[in-house]
Regions:
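N-terminal, charge-rich interaction modules
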Residues: 1-36
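Flexible, charged surface loops at secondary-structure boundaries
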Residues: 13-15, 55-59, 101-105
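Short basic, glycine-rich beta-strand/loop surfaces that mediate nucleic-acid
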Residues: 96-115
């Protein structure tokens, strides 16, 4: 896995948007529109609990949150509360990629690719 400002590459596929790696290892585009209404409050579209509902069905042992190239993605208190049900790792996206690459447990990840 590799990342740079505005992109991430996973398994040879390049994505020019935020992604979610699901517990079954499929990859989808992050549904940040669900959190867009909070942009004014945070100055940036945060990650909110409304985006994390998929975790209930997937039941990962671990959740990774990649907070962007510089670690600027805000995590709302509601998201933090929901994430307390899981082992979580929240770090800048470039820092978190090696951890994801070596993880053997069932996990999910939300990865921000810009700031």
């Amino acid at each position: 896995m590799e990342t740079g400002f505005g992109w991430i590459e996973v398994d040879g596929m390049r994505y020019n948007h935020d992604i979610v790696i699901h517990a079954d290892r499929t990859i989808t585009k992050r549904k940040k529109k669900l959190s867009k209404g909070l942009k004014g409050e945070y100055g940036h579209t945060p990650i909110d609990d409304t985006e994390l509902g998929f975790l209930f069905d997937e039941k990962p042992a671990l959740v990774f949150i990649g907070t962007g190239q510089y670690g600027d993605l805000p995590v709302t208190p509601a998201a933090e509360q929901l994430l307390k049900r899981y082992i979580i790792v929240i770090k800048p996206t470039p820092t978190i990629l090696p951890l994801i690459g070596s993880e053997l447990r069932k996990f999910a990840a939300v990865l921000h690719v810009t700031c």
